[in-house]
Amino acid sequence: MSQQIHLSIDAMGGDQGPRLVIEASIAFLKRYPHTRLTLFGDFADLEAAVKGSVCASRMSLIQTEITVAADERAGSALRHKQGSSMWKAVELVATGQADACVSGGNTGALMAMGRKLIKTFPGVSRPAICKPIPTARGSSFILDLGANLNCSAQQLVQFALMGSALARVYGRENPSVALLNVGTELSKGSESILTAAALMREHPTINFAGFVEGHGLYQGEVDVVVCDGLIGNVALKVSEGVAAFIASSLKAKLRENRFNQIAGLIVEPLLRRWMAAYNPSNFNGAAMLGLQRTLVKSHGGTDKFGFEQALVAAVDQVSANIPERIAQCL
């Protein structure tokens, strides 16, 4: 990375507040010496967290007194929060002063501000949220994850094109694409899914592999999984909930009695490695595909390492010219 990359950060977004964002930012800057950050938020809080850091010279802090609430409607945020940390962070990218924006704040508001300030490519009605998920064969990309609750067949085809472009950046030469559906039979699915499948089969640049069911999502049989935002968001959050339940119930079982505690001492190192490999923080940082510049959504409840990974995702997307590649595919 020879050219310095400038990231714009909404430091007030997310559940943990600005201190976690600053700690993650400092760790990120140590890993990526050719980057600099501009953070928007409460100046006093940001300055206190940055004070004494060896990376302070590569961090610009800008005061904003307004924040976007987690439950605020997107329309309200557009009308009333134009001085917020989120708006200012997105605006810095829209005006070309920064290369990418990262926020862990309100997804709907962030998407609306991205569309308003950065704009989508011609023909793209709404961006799609896309991120990698761990699978038995490495990882797959899934989109949309909540930006578009109801999608036309044409939108699903657009998602397939954009997801394929992102997958190619990560080394998938001819990425396979599947539609998430209630069955693998050609006759099953809603009208929009069946129409999208027909269009994808005939499309010259989509390597369509048919349908994938929910239980096959983590088998890694395809590179890109396409669905509407309602299905995608529910599937992702159910998966996170099941994973958390399994981990907590297993820990409880291993503490249940003395025999289990002894067994736990034996298997604990293996379990730690397994949990670390599939930790959602490793895959944090969702791309908002279809915008003319790079905008990355961090999970609001992520930890320090997770937010750091969202910053890494932003750098990867800028370095690979993702928006330009998306435009070429549409």
Swiss-Prot record:
GO molecular function list: phosphate:acyl-[acyl carrier protein] acyltransferase activity
Q: Which UniProt keywords apply?
A: Cytoplasm, Lipid biosynthesis, Lipid metabolism, Phospholipid biosynthesis, Phospholipid metabolism, Transferase
* Stated name of the protein: Phosphate acyltransferase
Where it sits in the cell: the answer is: Cytoplasm
Q: What does this protein do?
A: Catalyzes the reversible formation of acyl-phosphate (acyl-PO(4)) from acyl-[acyl-carrier-protein] (acyl-ACP). This enzyme utilizes acyl-ACP as fatty acyl donor, but not acyl-CoA.
Q: Does the keyword Transport apply?
A: no
**What quaternary structure, including any partners, is listed in this protein's UniProt entry?**
Homodimer. Probably interacts with PlsY.
Report which superkingdom the organism of origin falls in.
Bacteria
Transmembrane segment boundaries? none
Q: What does the entry give for GO biological process? A: fatty acid biosynthetic process; phospholipid biosynthetic process
Q: What class of enzyme is it?
A: transferase
Its cellular-component GO annotations read:
cytoplasm
The UniProt record lists the EC number as: 2.3.1.274
The record's Pfam families line, in alphabetical order, gives: FA_synthesis (PF02504)
Checking InterPro entries in the record gives: FA_synthesis, Phospholipid_synth_PlsX-like
Q: In which pathway does it act?
A: Lipid metabolism; phospholipid metabolism
Asked if the Swiss-Prot or TrEMBL record annotates the protein with the keyword Cytoplasm, the reply is yes
Its recorded reaction(s) are: a fatty acyl-[ACP] + phosphate = an acyl phosphate + holo-[ACP]
